[in-house]
Swiss-Prot record:
Alpha subunit of the heteropentameric ligand-gated chloride channel gated by gamma-aminobutyric acid (GABA), a major inhibitory neurotransmitter in the brain. GABA-gated chloride channels, also named GABA(A) receptors (GABAAR), consist of five subunits arranged around a central pore and contain GABA active binding site(s) located at the alpha and beta subunit interface(s). When activated by GABA, GABAARs selectively allow the flow of chloride anions across the cell membrane down their electrochemical gradient. Alpha-6/GABRA6 subunits are found at both synaptic and extrasynaptic sites. This is Gamma-aminobutyric acid receptor subunit alpha-6. The gene is Gabra6. Residues 1-19 form the signal peptide. Residues 265-270, 326-422 are cytoplasmic. It is found in: Postsynaptic cell membrane; Cell membrane. It is a multi-pass membrane protein. InterPro entries: GABAA/Glycine_rcpt, GABAAa_rcpt, GABBAa6_rcpt, Gabra-1-6_TM, Neur_chan_lig-bd, Neur_chan_lig-bd_sf, Neur_channel, Neuro-gated_channel_TM_sf. Heteropentamer, formed by a combination of alpha (GABRA1-6), beta (GABRB1-3), gamma (GABRG1-3), delta (GABRD), epsilon (GABRE), rho (GABRR1-3), pi (GABRP) and theta (GABRQ) chains, each subunit exhibiting distinct physiological and pharmacological properties. Binds UBQLN1. The lineage of its organism: Eukaryota, Metazoa, Chordata, Craniata, Vertebrata.
Length: 453
């Protein structure tokens, strides 16, 4: 029996402690509820803290959970963030069992909150699954921490002159919608270097590298007063891999293919014509497809200049063959005229012979019956005396020339234009590429962001 007494005392003590804890918990919750009720009693959430007196300072910082995608055609970007705001409301000071009260989003609607909006935002979404994603904490000195999870779709002006070697500074601008700077000012909670956090795993983009971010603040004037605007610039550098594979390499290969025609015989007109027309059509297709991923801007980009020069080289190769063919035909006609001029006088056949044949057949003595045809200038001796008279009476007529076939000089071989083109075209294209890539790769193409503090 004595052995059971310690166990009984232990059980009684544990039950007593649990009862005390339950009483303390109930007292704590009742105390907090009473504190909140007292704070909200007579509280007007239509008035900002310090209304009619001091300026309300709202400290902000941003944590980016996901950055992207970035659209060049629409000139916009999307990101998910935790947007944090901190301010002090003297009306919410309290003394109680805890220094910080962690409350849910229902408390937000009962107190004053800043009317922050995103000036360059096209569409912003506050997440509500499974409940509104909002964090609310109240410190004993009246300081409030208010955090929201947002998806922001914001405008990003882009100057695409250096595309695709370009960089952009995409801004995110926010401030008060109704309160001028005489009533509300915004500041960076952790300073300009650490107030915006972008983890490396949150910025994996397909076409860009997020190389950093900068913050600034500025004051703008409008008809309703001066407002403080906070700005975050996200610096993006474009990746060139896609465009090297899809645009630049095919253009270079097409130009090289067009220059292969310089090594084809100039007599092969169909082959060289097919080369020229095919490469021109290929360049046209490439130039059209390259524009699909770009907005319809009114100026030429760096890629447009490259495609235009490649198109000029391809078209020049086709014009070069036209020139070769023209001068080849011109040379052939000239050689034909020279051959006709240099031809020797033809061997003549006298018409006297033809007349003589007829006379001899008619007037010859029937005794001899001369039927042999005379086909040369030298006549055989005819025993008839009348034949001699016929010869003496036959007039000598001018001869008719017999033109022998012309022997034209060969026009084959390599044209001098082709010989020069085999050297000039590759050298010129290589020089253009050298200058083009040196200029754009060594150029600072990142857009400059304004950093007015």
């Amino acid at each position: 029996m004595l052995l059971l007494l310690p166990w009984l005392f232990s059980l009684l003590w544990i039950e007593n402690a649990q009862a005390q804890l339950e009483d303390e918990g109930n007292f704590y919750s009742e105390n907090v509820s009473r504190i909140l009720d007292n704070l909200l009693e007579g509280y007007d959430n239509r008035l900002r803290p310090g209304f009619g007196g001091a300026v309300t300072e709202v400290k902000t910082d941003i944590y980016v959970t996901s950055f992207g995608p970035v659209s060049d055609v629409e000139m916009e970007y999307t990101m998910d963030v935790f947007f944090r705001q901190t301010w002090t409301d003297e009306r919410l000071k309290f003394k109680g069992p805890a220094e910080i009260l962690s409350l849910n989003n229902l408390m937000v609607s009962k107190i004053w909150t800043p009317d922050t909006f995103f000036r360059n935002g096209k569409k912003s979404i506050a997440h509500n699954m499974t409940t509104p994603n909002k964090l609310f904490r109240l410190m004993h000195n009246g300081t409030i921490l208010y955090t929201m999870r947002l998806t922001i779709n914001a405008d990003c002006p882009m100057r695409l002159v250096n595309f695709p070697m370009d960089g952009h500074a995409c801004p995110l601008k926010f401030g008060s919608y109704a309160y001028p700077k005489s009533e509300i000012i915004y500041t960076w909670k952790k300073g300009p270097l650490y107030s915006v956090e972008v983890p490396e795993e949150s910025s994996s983009l397909l076409q860009y590298d997020l190389i950093g971010q900068t913050v600034s603040s500025e004051t703008i004037k409008s008809n309703t007063g001066e407002y403080v605007i906070m700005t975050v610039y996200f610096h993006l550098q474009r990746k060139m891999g896609y465009f090297m594979i899809q645009i630049y390499t095919p253009c270079i290969m097409t130009v090289i293919l067009s220059q292969v025609s310089f090594w084809i015989n100039k007599e092969s007109v169909p082959a060289r014509t097919v080369f020229g027309i095919t490469t021109v059509l290929t360049m046209t297709t490439l130039s059209i497809s390259a524009r699909h991923s770009l907005p319809k801007v009114s100026y030429a980009t760096a890629m447009d200049w490259f495609i235009a020069v490649c198109f000029a080289f391809v078209f020049s190769a086709l014009i070069e063959f036209a020139a070769v063919n023209y001068f080849t035909n011109l040379q052939s006609q000239k050689a034909e005229r020279q051959a006709q001029t240099a031809a020797k006088p033809p061997v003549a056949k006298s018409k006297t012979t033809e007349s003589l044949e007829a006379e001899i057949v008619v007037h010859s003595d029937s005794k001899y019956h001369l039927k042999k045809r005379i086909s040369s200038l030298t006549l055989p001796i005819v025993p008839s005396s009348e034949a001699s008279k016929v010869l003496s009476r036959t007039p000598i007529l001018p001869s008719t020339p017999v033109t022998p076939p012309l022997l034209l000089p060969a026009i084959g071989g390599t044209s001098k234009i082709d010989q020069y083109s085999r050297i000039l075209f590759p050298v010129a294209f290589a020089g253009f590429n050298l200058v083009y890539w040196i200029v754009y790769l060594s150029k600072d193409t990142m857009e400059v962001s304004s950093t007015v503090e």
